[in-house]
Amino acid sequence: LQTNGTLITEEWCALFRENNFLVGVSIDGPEDIHDAYRRNKGGGPTFGKVVEGVSLLKQERVEFNTLSTVNRLSEGRGTEVYRFMKSLGSRFMQFLPVLEHTKKGPVTGRDIIVPPGTPGASLAQWSVSAKGFGRFMNDVFDEWVLNDVGRYYVQLFDVALAQWAGVPPALCSFGEPFGEALGVEHN
């Protein structure tokens, strides 16, 4: 189950624990990184509620991992984000690059998110650059390989190492051909 963690209660935790759920919590890093783009419907910050949800999962002994999006704001802060996830108690981490495309809307002239390949679209200003994502993951790797191999798990590293050892890839982006997995998007 993947959640933003803002509505986790003791009752939800009991259901998760009794049914052996693994709960993925979406959190992008420390408060300033997380709250830059993860806002509630009213436009307010969500960091405090997410951290409360994680605390409740830990208190109620529900296994969880974290999923963090890497954007333009976080691209130079890989070590900091990784250490923050460890401080939350996350032993299994996923880091995904934000790569969204925008185009000026015909009526408002405001940027709207569009599918990649849309004529006239460009990479959104909040998207992580290729070099930025590489630097982020290199920084995470340097910290992980020096201090945490076998104690903390980063999905991208685990999949790469497994494939190197001949294990079929668990991520579609590592497979041949790329793109055999279905993705469901909100838009």
Each PLM stretch: what is its role?
Residues 1-31:
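Conserved SAM/AdoMet-binding glycine-rich loop
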Residues 23-24, 50-54:
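A conserved non-catalytic segment of reverse transcriptases
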Residues 36-48, 55, 59-187:
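Radical SAM enzyme [4Fe-4S]-AdoMet core and its adjacent flexible, acidic
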